[in-house]
Amino acid sequence: MERVQPLEENVGNAARPRFERNKLLLVASVIQGLGLLLCFTYICLHFSALQVSHRYPRIQSIKVQFTEYKKEKGFILTSQKEDEIMKVQNNSVIINCDGFYLISLKGYFSQEVNISLHYQKDEEPLFQLKKVRSVNSLMVASLTYKDKVYLNVTTDNTSLDDFHVNGGELILIHQNPGEFCVL
């Protein structure tokens, strides 16, 4: 026959599985708590990311017209919109951002003219035409902060009383927003 163990020995052996069961429950609770913490962190990060607006920089652009001619200043550049980022100062378009610019120049003149488009005083012009009555040009130029784009129109005719232009416009559009800008 088999020998039966006394009750005291059974109690001693039974406590060990109960301790391992408590240890297993503790480990499972810790894992659940960490999972809950990770879920809570993910939800908080998700909602905080929704509150941050992803704003792209406004594209630098301007459309100016030149229709009025003054003997001292040449053609006067005027912008039709007040809310444009780029501005006209001292008859020049001020460049605020480094990068490539798409430049369009159009106009029909009443006389033969010499036209040049400059960006710095002592540099070669971006664009130059001699003895023309109209211009319709499109170009890309690399401009930097503090450059000033201005138009120089001259004529050999001494009578400037009837000197005018039809449809004179200059358009500049920055092609790579996000470059160095000072606004």
From Swiss-Prot:
GO terms for molecular function: cytokine activity; signaling receptor binding; tumor necrosis factor receptor binding; tumor necrosis factor receptor superfamily binding. This is Tumor necrosis factor ligand superfamily member 4. It is a single-pass type II membrane protein. The chain crosses the membrane at residues 24-50. Cytokine that binds to TNFRSF4. Co-stimulates T-cell proliferation and cytokine production. Keywords: Cytokine, Disulfide bond, Glycoprotein, Membrane, Signal-anchor, Systemic lupus erythematosus, Transmembrane, Transmembrane helix. Belongs to the tumor necrosis factor family. Induction: By HTLV-1 transactivator p40-Tax. It is found in: Membrane. Residues 51-183 are extracellular. The keyword Membrane applies. Residues 51-173 form the THD domain. Glycans are attached at residues 90, 114, 152, 157. It is linked to Systemic lupus erythematosus: A chronic, relapsing, inflammatory, and often febrile multisystemic disorder of connective tissue, characterized principally by involvement of the skin, joints, kidneys and serosal membranes. It is of unknown etiology, but is thought to represent a failure of the regulatory mechanisms of the autoimmune system. The disease is marked by a wide range of system dysfunctions, an elevated erythrocyte sedimentation rate, and the formation of LE cells in the blood or bone marrow. It comes from the Eukaryota. Homotrimer. Its main location: membrane. GO terms for biological process: acute inflammatory response; cellular response to lipopolysaccharide; cellular response to prostaglandin E stimulus; defense response to nematode; immune response; inflammatory response; memory T cell activation; negative regulation of DNA-binding transcription factor activity. One of its GO terms (cellular component) is plasma membrane. Residues 1-23 are cytoplasmic.
